């Protein structure tokens, strides 16, 4: 596989029917979460992770099956009506981000000329940056609209709470990485990248 590009195109917003202003507020909250590491992080924070498809999130929030959800970008949550029933979104989110990747087979990559590869990489970066800028602007516009209307409380965690959640996540990552040599290799690569990028 040859990677043309990958990256997060938006900052997710956490959907919630209850105010979650810091890690301690997760205690007992039923959170829709992907299985695996994400669920482990929420569990360690005191939440009760519930695994379900993203398409089931609205109905589960509406019926009280869950209280909150690791779901999508603010604009997507708004378009899907999430804020009509979950009036305490956390933005910027405190969890995973949506990732876009574009890969091609190594055999295909080897057949491309240098100019074709540059064109493909340039196209991807332009499309990716356009999408990222679009969602950043749209999310900010919608957050400003919702704050002004006063019907939704947009919660922005203070730095110390974000740092506390990050430490919980790092502990979960390290424990998972101890499970196999391959997991440790991936963990080390990610931690190295995050430190280099100033994220850790």
Regions found by a protein language model. Give the residues of each.
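N-terminal secretory/targeting leader peptides
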Residues: 1-200
């Amino acid at each position: 596989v040859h990677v043309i590009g990958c990256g997060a195109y938006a900052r997710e917003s956490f959907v919630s029917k209850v105010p979650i202003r810091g890690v301690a507020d997760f205690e007992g909250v039923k959170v829709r979460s992907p299985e695996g590491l994400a669920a482990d992080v929420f569990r360690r924070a005191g939440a009760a992770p519930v695994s379900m498809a993203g398409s089931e999130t609205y109905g589960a929030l509406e019926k009280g099956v869950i209280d909150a959800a690791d779901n999508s970008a603010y604009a997507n949550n708004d378009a899907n009506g999430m804020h009509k029933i979950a009036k305490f979104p956390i933005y910027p989110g405190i969890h995973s981000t949506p990732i876009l990747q574009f890969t091609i087979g190594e055999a295909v990559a080897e057949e491309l000329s240098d100019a074709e590869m540059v064109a493909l990489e340039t196209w991807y970066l332009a499309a990716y940056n356009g999408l990222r800028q679009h969602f950043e602007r749209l999310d900010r516009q919608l957050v400003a609209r919702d704050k002004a209307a006063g019907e939704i409380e947009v919660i922005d965690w203070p730095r110390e709470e974000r740092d506390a959640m990050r430490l919980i996540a790092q502990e979960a990552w390290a424990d998972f990485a101890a499970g196999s040599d391959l997991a440790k290799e991936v963990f080390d690569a990610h931690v190295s990248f995050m430190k280099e990028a100033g994220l850790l």
